[in-house]
A protein has these predicted regions:
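Intrinsically disordered, low-complexity basic tails/linkers immediately adjacent to helix-turn-helix/homeobox/MYB/SANT
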Residues: 8-10
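Conserved phosphate-binding loops in nucleotide/dinucleotide-binding enzymes
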Residues: 12-13, 17
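Glycine-rich phosphate-binding segment of PLP-dependent enzymes
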Residues: 31-39
Length: 168
């Protein structure tokens, strides 16, 4: 299934079986429970009780109170299609020591896409549309972008956490 993107191109969605959706949802709950405490306050995408609206409210408060002066917009081109599996597995293993969960994750990543009876396999990327995809995205971006941004700009930028507020 495809949905239109803002640039006019199409985005492929991974449509899973009902059984896979149930298991992915359960794994998403587990991963969220483990990683939610690690995610930065500035990260609002695909998180409980957070949304683009909460990010905008926080940014507005920062601008009104003069502790946020700049906004940096980050758009990772073809993000879901280019997630490195080896790094994603390392990031998950950093906090989760469950071989069964890691095996499930590997199966989902390697499942491929069937279109017109032909299965296309990939060596990278996270399928969009599955219940576990948003939390996997947040885990990957936490280590690859959020922590780097915090370390790189924390000392030179007051209100650094808000610069990433609109991610997601």
């Amino acid at each position: 299934m495809y949905i239109p993107k803002a640039n006019g191109k199409l985005r492929a969605l991974g449509i899973t079986t009902i059984e896979d959706r149930v298991v992915q949802k359960a794994v998403a709950w587990v991963l969220s429970a483990v990683f939610e405490q690690d995610f930065l306050d500035s990260s609002h995408g695909f998180r409980p009780n957070r949304s683009p609206h909460t990010a905008l409210h926080r940014l507005r408060d920062g601008m009104m109170q003069h502790w946020a002066k700049y906004v940096v917009e980050v758009d990772v081109v073809s993000y879901f299609d280019t997630v490195n599996w080896a790094w994603l597995r390392k990031f998950v293993r950093h906090r989760v020591n469950d071989g069964g969960l890691i095996r499930l994750l590997n199966k989902w990543l390697k499942a491929g896409v069937m279109e017109n009876g032909v299965v296309t396999l990939s060596a990278e990327g996270v399928p969009q549309g599955g219940p576990v995809s948003p939390v996997l995205s947040n885990i990957y971006l936490h280590y690859v972008l959020d922590l780097w941004f915090e370390r790189r700009f924390k000392k030179t930028c007051r209100g650094y956490a808000e610069l990433d507020a609109l991610r997601g």
